[in-house]
Structures are given as structure tokens and as C-alpha cells.
Amino acid sequence: DALRESVQPPPAADMLVYARRGSTSQRCVSPALDAALEAALRSAAARSGLRFVVHDDGATAAEQVSPFARAVAVVGPHGAALALATACAPGTLLVELPVLPLRSNYFAAMAAALGLNYRLFPNIASRTHGPFRAANRTAHFADPACDDGASLEAAAASLADEVVAAIRS
């Protein structure tokens, strides 16, 4: 609550935030997948009448917290940036692109404690200590062989459709 109260007054929720994962991490999002996700989520924001913001971890703490406090939805790969969802208002949609196999789901527990609407989207995932990729329909989880443009765009579009449906419900 102290973090939420530090952003006064409570801002109007009008943003879809893409919490991009840094490229220096072992579990990075490939440039092609990142571009597909950003384009699909930007479109989802426009369809939902929301402002689209890409989280920048180079900003000051206050600049990083502000978009999360105004978010209707936050989408991002498993990583520290999703911890900024502690600034989100109850009911905010939090969509995590997971690391598989799941060992512990910190963000689901955090979302439950904060009253956020948590969703896991396993169609875009990372194997433990590997890059995030689009999932192959025949594989249990992410398969590097399917990291082509069509698969990336289809997976990103599917994610965007799920986000729009959840926002509208």
C-alpha cells in the first residue's frame, strides 16, 4: 500500500504496459519476438482505447512505477520488471510469459495477495535458462524450430487477443 500511496493521487487506469525483458539476460526475448509482441500489444491497446507503454528499466524509480500504477493490464516475460505490478490497482490484469517447467510461481502469489487478475500465457515461454520463444503447437513448450516470423506473429496475436478479451470481461 505504501508504494501505491507514493503515487498520489490515485491515477486513472488508462494504460497497457509491456514489461520488456532486458537483452543482457540469459532469458532474453529475441528481437523478432520482442517486435512481434510490441506490435500486437500496441494494437491491443488501440483496440481497447488504452495508451501503450513499454517499460524502460533505465528510468528513475518514480518513472518506472507510474505506468504500472495507471495500468489496466501489464504483460511481460517472467522477470524482475513484473515486480513493479505491486504498484497496480486491484483488478489490474497481469499476464506472465513463463519460464517452463514451472517451479514456483511468485507472480501468481503476488497477484493473489494484491487482488490482481493473473494469467499465465505458456504459448510464449522460456525453458529454464534459455531464451523466450513462441511455442510449437506439437511441443509441450517453447521450441526453437518454431521461431520463424509466422509463428512469432501468430503467438503474439493470440496473446493480444487474450489480453483484449480479459480487459473487456
Please place each PLM-identified region on the residue numbering:
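The feature primarily captures lumenal catalytic ectodomains
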Residues: 1-169
